[in-house]
Amino acid sequence: MAYKIIRDENNKYQLGREIEAVLDSTADLDDLGTDYCPGSVAIVADKGAPAYMLNASGVWKEI
């Protein structure tokens, strides 16, 4: 299992980094962590698999 961060930049409006990442599986969310700004996106690279966005509470939610 693995993930790749494809965009990583400082957020203009909040202190911290906002990312976009591609994951092999949903289980990779645990490895990715939650040390990013709300609005960060993680996409599972599998047909029909969900995408996730980090909310203000620091929880990855399916979008």
Predicted regions and their residues:
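Extracellular/surface-exposed low-complexity repeats and stalk/linker segments enriched in Gly/Pro
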Residues: M1-A49
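Tryptophan-centered short beta-strand motifs
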Residues: Y3, S57-I63
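Short beta-strand segments and strand-loop junctions that repeat across beta-rich extracellular domains
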Residues: G48-G58
